[in-house]
Amino acid sequence: MPEREFLHLDVEGVKAIHAEVLGAHGGSTGLRDVGLLESAVAAPQASFGGEPLIKDLIEIAAAYLFYLCRNHPFVDGNKRTALAASLVFLKENGELKDPGLPARSIDAWETLVLDVAASRIDREETTVRLRRLLRRRKK
């Protein structure tokens, strides 16, 4: 069976997500380092010999969350943008109908993002926890 092709995020799309996040929740505008943004957007799409290194939808979403959060490319709103970008990626690829977060689990989502930002978890653990949160979300 052929591998599924995903609709990936691009730099301009992530900038738009960032602007929307700041518009909704406030914060300072500005891009701190375009190279770090480009790197964070490219990492989940990396390939070797024409084969994607990450083939699982949730793992790709976790990679967007992880690299956007850890690379800190924006002046403000990096954690919020990282989570929003991850959820938009999942929505665009049919995993979520609505990228909003249910109020009952907001603390768990916040803990995930804060743990990524503080380097308390690696990309693999980010994937495990994101997968768990998404399963809970569907219940």
Regions found by a protein language model. Give the residues of each.
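FIC/Doc superfamily catalytic core
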Residues: 1-139
